[in-house]
Amino acid sequence: MRCIIRKVNYRRSLAIFEDVFGDYGYFEMLGKDGLEEDDVIVGNLHNLGGEVIVNDRTGEKYDVFIEAFGMSLKIAMEQVFKEK
C-alpha cells in the first residue's frame, strides 16, 4: 500500500502517514530517521507491529513499528506530539 508521510516528530522518532483511503496512522522509526513530510512510502501499513517500508523515491528501506492506523489526523497528531 502506498502512503504519504504527513508529519514527523524527530524527537520521538514517530511519523504520521495518510493511506489511500484518507485515514491516518503512525509508526515508530527503528534504527534510522530519514523520512520527511510528503515522502511516499510503500509497505503493509495496516498491520500493527514490525514492518519494513520502502521510500518510493529513493528505494531506501526502513524498519518501523506500526503503532496505529485507521484514525483521524487530529487523533494521530495528539498521539505523536503529546508530551509524556
Model-identified regions with their sequence ranges:
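Structural detector for short beta-strands of small beta-barrel domains
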Residues: 1-10
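Short aromatic-glycine-enriched beta-strand elements
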Residues: 11-16
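Short solvent-exposed strand/turn elements
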Residues: 19-25, 81-84
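Beta-strand/loop nucleic-acid-binding surfaces
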Residues: 23-35
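Short, Lys/Arg- and Gly-enriched loop/turn segments at beta-strand edges
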Residues: 46-57
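Short peripheral tails and domain-boundary helices/loops at the edges of structured domains
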Residues: 56-84
